[in-house]
Amino acid sequence: MKALHFGAGNIGRGFIGKLLADAGIQLTFADVNQVVLDALNARHSYQVHVVGENEQVDTVSGVNAVSSIGDDVVDLIAHVDLITTAVGPVVLERIAPAIAKGLAKRKAQGVDAPLNIIACENMVRGTTQLKGHVMNALADGDKAWVEQHVGFVDSAVDRIVPPSASATHDPLEVTVETFSEWIVDKTQFKGALPNIPGMELTDNLMAFVERKLFTLNTGHAITAYLGKLAGHQTIRDAILDESIRAVVKGAMEESGAVLIKRYGFDADKHAAYIQKILGRFENPYLKDDVERVGRQPLRKLSAGDRLIKPLLGTLEYGLPHVNLVKGIAAAMHFRSDEDPQAQELAALITEKGPQAALAQISGLDANSDVVAEAVNAYNATK
């Protein structure tokens, strides 16, 4: 089996690329970073530091690399069995034209074997969004063939991969946590379902997408925002602060009550899942900076994201949300000289006040009780 993976960054090498290579799949990375491409093609291997209770160093070998903006990547698409991505949500649109060219070439060469494409991004239904970009880039005469022969498979991914500690070290070395989860929608594949250790197949993807969003992402963000306010540097430092931990755990329990009501998750198993995530936040080997985790607060306060979406669920089912509201208030206080969204958020609050600003960002009714609760919490943490 041959696979092409877009994105040779830390997540690509440390998570999805590693799983594919470990499964014995012939893997080629596509990226724009020439330093990384040259290193991969010189060595055809790299090391992954897996950190946790049992630290180990794994070697990933037998890999190649091509530029994601050249003809080589188009040629590869015509012949591979699987395409995956870990490029970041905003970059999906940029790689779509190359994928479209490769699919057109595949059709022209009469390669009718099924091809499956899986976007492994921190977003909901990312592959469906990628499909839209690819379809827009295709000629009308190629679209029906693509619908017939190419599966666009949505997925949910979960593994903490912090940025490299130093810019001067080996460009291929990467550190990841022990935990990883890659859940894919088995109803969207073309051809036989793949057997890749570490890939979990489901016919109820949205339950797992929201479980991750409402638990890991919600908890991670609130830990970062409360941690920044309290002067902590890392997620570990913040979650070891008992006052922060109580709010984070409470928020995950509130969002968990929504998941249990909506999808029928087992309450005891979900409580264990929350405990596992708190343990991941405590990992002393992951130097996860609160400022990095907190960046892009406007996106994280939007209606479909990790803070407002679970809150809307509590309103839908008439469930408590006091800790989620505290997390939202902390997010409104997030300031960072390195993050344009943090600066935009601050300017919006200065211009319109917290009530109107939150309503504009989140889509919540400015006159609702829950916005009043958030504004009270915001003012209480000044």
From Swiss-Prot:
Pfam families: Mannitol_dh, Mannitol_dh_C. It is an enzyme of class 1 (oxidoreductase). The keyword Chaperone does not apply. NAD(+) binds at A3, L4, H5, F6, G7, A8, G9, N10, I11, G12, R13, G14. Its EC number is 1.1.1.17. Gene3D superfamilies: N-(1-d-carboxylethyl)-l-norvaline Dehydrogenase, domain 2, NAD(P)-binding Rossmann-like Domain. One of its GO terms (molecular function) is mannitol-1-phosphate 5-dehydrogenase activity. InterPro entries: 6-PGluconate_DH-like_C_sf, 6PGD_dom2, Mannitol_1_phos_5_DH, Mannitol_DH, Mannitol_DH_C, Mannitol_DH_CS, Mannitol_DH_N, NAD(P)-bd_dom_sf. The keyword Metal-binding does not apply. Keywords: NAD, Oxidoreductase. One of its GO terms (biological process) is mannitol catabolic process. It catalyses: D-mannitol 1-phosphate + NAD(+) = beta-D-fructose 6-phosphate + NADH + H(+). GO terms for cellular component: cytosol. HAMAP family: Mannitol_dehydrog. Belongs to the mannitol dehydrogenase family. This is Mannitol-1-phosphate 5-dehydrogenase. It comes from Salmonella enteritidis PT4 (strain P125109).
